[in-house]
């Protein structure tokens, strides 16, 4: 029986990517990488350049872009990737430079290169690199069939110690494969092998074979979406996290229902499966949909209110608001300037965490609900935590009866 070589596996993957409309580009060393990055960045920002009567960046301007990108930790660079950069041009103008289109992720420029040589403490050659707008955002390390997959993971760890630097600090995702087993993980050197994951379909059937994995995961729109929306920059740990497939599909289904139907739904994750991360990402992405006025995350105890706020803040500080009492809840839901001022509320997010008890009080007592007559008719999404406990009884009935344009999603770790 002939065992497929690593080189054959590499060429087969590149052929798959080219078949999915990736541009194959020959990059042998870092200087080639920078030259290609300049061309791709100009292509990606051509509209902004044209508005300013330009076709590209001068060498001095590009050096300033590189200098901006070189500074900071790996975590800070992940933020820079997603932010706009204000470039001061040679003639004194300011223009916006975008490194990644996170809103229309299919509109990024995708390329594939292989065997890029990088000099660090040691000279290393990387197997397959996916470039997005010229930046290396996905690195794939391959081993021939029959070789233990963890050897590819260990090789990535060695690269962290000996060669990754410069633009390669912008890698967001690693993929390792021996052809018959394929796993992916976020660029978090301290995560460990346990944080490498198989991809699956919606029915949890794993895409172990590299060609199956590549045809789905490396679809340009899918990969662009995962990098743009499903990598979490964990502020508490200053590290990158990538969602697992069941988390991805759960959030995608919630988004689909919100955008296209009025159906409710619930998500069941087993204990330890990352329910908090899934619910955070769902709330965050739902809040970004046009026409959604408020997202309310409902817990059934005050201690869970505080705990959830703390956990969400670890993912992204101040992404959500909490409420200490019903008055604050009314102020946040109504957005009334007078009430916000009364409770000294400076900012008011679209996402609010509260208890079912405070919410029930807000909708049943005239003293409070008179301030909610406007929001009760707006599009409101409620996410109930531990919905096997809170999705029943008079409180739930009162809340559902009050809001006229309400859509509900429940999360639980207990089978319903």
Predicted regions and their residues:
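ATP-dependent helicase/translocase motor core
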Residues: 2-299, 303-319, 347, 357, ...
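Proline- and acidic/polar-enriched loop/turn elements at helix boundaries
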Residues: 28-30, 324-325, 413
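Signature of the SF2 helicase/ATPase Hel1-core->accessory helical subdomain module
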Residues: 149, 357-416
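A generic local structural motif
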Residues: 160-162, 283-284, 336-340, 366-371, ...
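Short glycine/serine/threonine-enriched helix-capping/active-site loop
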Residues: 177, 354, 411
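Inter-Walker segment of RecA-like/P-loop motor cores
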Residues: 313-365
